[in-house]
Amino acid sequence: MFGIIISVIVLITMGYLILKNYKPQVVLAAAGIFLMMCGVWLGFGGVLDPTKSSGYLIVDIYNEILRMLSNRIAGLGLSIMAVGGYARYMERIGASRAMVSLLSRPLKLIRSPYIILSATYVIGQIMAQFITSASGLGMLLMVTLFPTLVSLGVSRLSAVAVIATTMSIEWGILETNSIFAAQVAGMKIATYFFHYQLPVASCVIISVAISHFFVQRAFDKKDKNINHEQAEQKALDNVPPLYYAILPVMPLILMLGSLFLAHVGLMQSELHLVVVMLLSLTVTMFVEFFRKHNLRETMDDVQAFFDGMGTQFANVVTLVVAGEIFAKGLTTIGTVDAVIRGAEHSGLGGIGVMIIMALVIAICAIVMGSGNAPFMSFASLIPNIAAGLHVPAVVMIMPMHFATTLARAVSPITAVVVVTSGIAGVSPFAVVKRTAIPMAVGFVVNMIATITLFY
């Protein structure tokens, strides 16, 4: 009991510090180290196996951190960095803008304002598989589709509400949290995406698109001061040829191709994600060179790939490791075992625990305005909890993953809401009033689809 009390105090302190914009990596790591020390001092057990212990607590703790860093950087971390590097490279050469320009063209042919509003959400979610920055995608859509939506009679608030939620489901083989979730669930990213994410995400996306249609139309009818003025139509700057739109999709094409070849026996196994990213990078370099005929500029642009890798290490990989340190602290002090025992005797079962954890992580995402910190803080705990409840880890980790990204779109302080609201000149608090119902619908469908399909 004393260990649980300490854990609760630490959790409250962590939440306060993160809300005050302290770096979550440092907060999580410090909390984990403190809990490991308390766990040993209170006699719950050691940090390392007795046969591997150095005899010094602080040395054992940092040896454990070294193990985590070594495992994550060489495996999951490298995949995340390669994906982040490729996304940065696509942004540098304009391929992301080409894809947005191409996919947004059919929408401009639709004249029904609320149908195009719902279609914008669906198209945005498709783009989200390849443009993995929510605020980046939001800004691109504000330039290309926001003026069209407003000119058709949709209010600015409705248009922003839909655009701000276009990455409310983070899915696909290029999305860093998906890669992390697959690793935690103990499976390859291709299996996680095609067998688990795709069916559930499809249900959620369709339900959210339909709810946007009715919710935004109802809000616009209710709002007596709705403004139908024309928004200035702007063109995307420096858009390369439209065939560049295939480049962000190339990793998915290569992954699908390798899965097919492995299935028919022409390859021993599907390509590793890092190999897919490097092959895509190589092909893109040749495309760039043959288009520009400038070897120096082509090679200089590749630096964006390595810059992106560094950014992912600093922002994401370190957060993953910090989350693991925190999870190790909770395990050492006995909190995880206590949660498992409590869940087993509560009668809630796997479904009840899954829903409660998804709600907790969703609330954290709304309060923090971020999905990464709460998800990566709790995700590492899931395998042990799931095993104790005799539930596959993926069945618990996936709804939590989707819950945190859905909830993020209801936070007035999350980056994509702030950025899109600022461009449109509307209040982020007014925007999240319009995103709350569609995201709540998505949350419920996420739970129902997961339970129905996989439990």
Curated annotation (Swiss-Prot):
It comes from the Bacteria. Pfam families: DcuC (PF03606). It is found in: Cell inner membrane. Signal peptide: none annotated. May have a role in the transport of dicarboxylates from the periplasm across the inner membrane. Seems not to be essential for growth. It is likely to be a cryptic gene, as no or low expression has been found under a number of growth conditions and when tested with a large number of potential substrates. Belongs to the DcuC/DcuD transporter (TC 2.A.61) family. This is Putative cryptic C4-dicarboxylate transporter DcuD. It comes from Escherichia coli (strain K12). The gene is dcuD.
